[in-house]
Design a protein with these regions (language model features):
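Metallo-beta-lactamase
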Residues: 2-137, 184-253, 274-280
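Cap/insert and terminal regions of metallo-dependent hydrolase folds
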Residues: 3-40, 45, 156, 181-190, ...
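Catalytic core of the metallo-beta-lactamase
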Residues: 111-114, 212-273, 288, 292-296
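Divalent metal-coordination and catalytic microenvironments
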Residues: 113, 123, 161, 168, ...
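Active-site metal-binding loops of divalent metal-dependent hydrolases
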Residues: 124-126, 162, 224-225, 255-257, ...
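Acidic/histidine-rich helix-loop elements
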Residues: 126-143, 227-233, 284-290
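Active-site metal-binding motif and surrounding structural segment of the metallo-beta-lactamase
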Residues: 136-183, 271-277
Length: 327
């Protein structure tokens, strides 16, 4: 009887600890009120959550969560983490000539663009961690040369989705004074308002919508093949890619995505592109529906009809299991 009581108390204690842990502000907040009603009216929201265009299992057929967790903790290739400090070059973002077009990649999925006089930041993660538990997914040495103090005020912050390696609580709070407008998917604004961002700077859209910005800049919101969630509840907001049209450039801003027909559709509707920025580095045989394999990235670039493509989500933190040589 005493043993049973101890087991019950331990389980109860774990539940309480988990509940308290999940109440931290960094986990954000589920959509509610008018935002939730708008979500429910989305053609992409079915059965209580946003859906991909194609059937998209989280894990490849024949595997399960136990298989994935086992490989994550015990099956990573020795090449998944560099043995030495990675080389980098730090560009001074505060002194850039305003008429110069620039792309600066910070590792993983974070990058800065200055295009036709506008400054743009995409999915910044500068805290050194891509996880709610800091020590589990830390940045590689040499990839964290920038801090939030290195950034000028910028016109547009793009957030493709709310995963920890794309929407970093610590980073966006520190950058708050620098941000003029935030462009993101429907539902993600709930996190940002919960973190005291002014709703008037938020532009939240569903797939296949158009945003008219200043000085000849336009954004078309386009699909990806992925999922979202910062805690237990999944797919309460929509994951995005974006078509950015400027006076002289057309750029595809790709979020995390498995390969699918949406790339060809986007290419047919909006191509050709001057530049497509595509993920390539989070690939794994168990994740093939939600992250592209290297050869699929090339096909996506072809589908998009892009003149140039830049691959991102390269090594910054040890999330991938397969050898980096596959790149």
């Amino acid at each position: 009887m005493n043993l049973l009581l101890i087991i019950v108390l331990v389980i109860l204690a774990l539940i309480i600890v988990a509940y308290v842990f999940l109440q931290q502000p960094k986990f954000g907040k589920r959509p509610a009120g008018e935002r939730l009603e708008k979500i429910k009216n989305s053609p992409n929201y079915k059965n209580g959550q946003f859906q991909n265009l194609s059937h998209t299992p989280d894990i490849t057929d024949g595997a399960n969560y136990f298989t994935v967790l086992k490989e994550f903790f015990f099956g990573k290739s020795k090449r998944s983490k560099p043995p030495t400090t990675l080389p980098s070059q730090k560009t001074n973002l505060l002194t850039l000539p305003p008429d110069k077009n620039v792309l600066v990649w910070f590792g993983h999925s974070s990058y800065f663009m200055q295009v036709d006089g506008k400054t743009i930041l995409v999915d910044p993660v500068l805290s050194g961690s891509a996880s709610p538990i800091r020590f589990t997914t830390t940045s590689f040495k040499g990839t964290d040369v920038y801090t939030t103090d290195d950034f000028p005020a910028f016109d547009y912050l793009f957030i493709t989705h709310d995963h920890w390696d794309h929407l970093d609580y610590e980073t966006v709070l520190k950058l708050k004074p620098n941000i003029k407008k935030i462009i993101t998917g429907l539902g993600t604004g709930e996190h940002l308002q919960h973190w005291s961002f002014d709703k008037n700077i938020l532009i939240e859209k569903d797939w296949n919508e158009t945003i008219i910005l200043e000085n000849g800049f336009t954004v078309n919101t386009t699909p990806g093949r992925h999922f979202i969630g910062r805690a237990i509840k999944r797919n309460s907001a929509i994951w995005m890619s974006f078509v950015l049209t400027t006076p002289t450039q057309k750029i595809f801003i790709g979020g995390d995505s498995g390969y699918d027909t949406h790339f060809k559709t986007i290419g047919d509707n909006f191509g050709p592109f001057d530049l497509a920025i595509l993920e390539c580095g989070q690939y794994n045989r168990y994740w093939k529906y939600i992250h592209m394999m290297p050869e699929e990235v090339v096909q996506a670039a072809i589908d998009l009809k892009t003149k140039l493509y830049c691959r991102y989500t390269g090594p910054n933190s040890p999330c991938l299991y397969m050898p980096g040589m596959s790149l």
